[in-house]
Amino acid sequence: MFGVLNSNDHRAAVQQRNIPAFGRTSFEPWTDNPTSNYRCETGGNGRDSGQNRVRRPMNAFMVWSRDQRRKVALENPQMQNSEISKQLGYQWKMLTEAEKWPFFEEAQRLQAMHREKYPDYKYRPRRKALPQKSDKLLPAASSSMLCRQVLVDEKWYPFTYRDSCSRAAHSRMEDQLSSSQPVNIANWLLQQEHHYRSTSLRDSPETLAAHLSADPPFYPKEQLGLSDAYFP
């Protein structure tokens, strides 16, 4: 019994030693030392996931803004990072060449160290993700929907002709549409659709056929800008 208890205590002690401390990360933390910029990142996203990725060496602006960004953030804790970057960019442009020169020298030194440590390094920018194409179909044009609703055909329209009057009105409309006289069909269809919606749904099929068989407006070919090539 004592042997079992001792083995359990030993396992618990080993597991407790293997548990990392809270807040401790697996990579080297950032410091104010410029050489810390050369560390490798692990666990990156994208194509570098699971592989070590080498960071680019800092340029002169990054060397200068490293301390300036911390100073501005302490003075303005409510300012967003994008606004801080804009302010630092404006301040950097206002510096003279003599004031910028020490930071250019430091950047050249860091680049030389980077080349010595990573001689085969090549900068490979990450590709921007392409927007995914939507599979949703675009809504149909109102004119095509209108034509499907207004066309009076025994195959499409839900009612049948009960008397000779409604059938004659239907044949009359077909003769007018197929005649050689040019007609502004689009405007006529819009007028008929508006009139159809204004009527009650309780109207009989004969009444609807009478409304649809109204004479369409006549427009001469010169007004429409059409030639005889479109009409026989």
Swiss-Prot record:
Q: Which GO terms describe its molecular function?
A: calmodulin binding; DNA-binding transcription activator activity, RNA polymerase II-specific; RNA polymerase II cis-regulatory region sequence-specific DNA binding
A Pfam family the protein falls into = HMG_box
Decide whether keyword Transcription regulation is in the record. yes
Extract one GO cellular component term from the record: nuclear speck
List the stretches of this chain annotated as a DNA-binding region: 54-122
Q: Which domain of life is it from?
A: Eukaryota
Q: Name one GO biological process term.
A: sex differentiation
Keyword Transcription regulation in annotation: yes
Keywords attached to this entry: Activator, Calmodulin-binding, Cytoplasm, Differentiation, DNA-binding, Nucleus, Sexual differentiation, Transcription, Transcription regulation
> Which cell locations does it reside in?
Nucleus speckle; Cytoplasm; Nucleus
Instruction: Give the matching Gene3D superfamilies.
Output: High mobility group box domain
Residue ranges, annotated region (Disordered): 24-53
Database matches in InterPro entries: HMG_box_dom, HMG_box_dom_sf, SRY, SRY-related_HMG-box_TF-like
Q: How does it assemble?
A: Interacts with CALM, EP300, HDAC3, KPNB1, ZNF208 isoform KRAB-O, PARP1, SLC9A3R2 and WT1. The interaction with EP300 modulates its DNA-binding activity. The interaction with KPNB1 is sensitive to dissociation by Ran in the GTP-bound form. Interaction with PARP1 impaired its DNA-binding activity.
Q: Which PANTHER family match?
A: SEX-DETERMINING REGION Y PROTEIN, SOX TRANSCRIPTION FACTOR
Q: Write out the similarity annotation.
A: Belongs to the SRY family.
Task performed by this protein: Transcriptional regulator that controls a genetic switch in male development. It is necessary and sufficient for initiating male sex determination by directing the development of supporting cell precursors (pre-Sertoli cells) as Sertoli rather than granulosa cells. Involved in different aspects of gene regulation including promoter activation or repression. Binds to the DNA consensus sequence 5'-[AT]AACAA[AT]-3'. SRY HMG box recognizes DNA by partial intercalation in the minor groove and promotes DNA bending. Also involved in pre-mRNA splicing.
Which protein are we looking at?
Answer: Sex-determining region Y protein
Question: Species name for this entry?
Answer: Pusa hispida
Classification of source organism = Eukaryota, Metazoa, Chordata, Craniata, Vertebrata
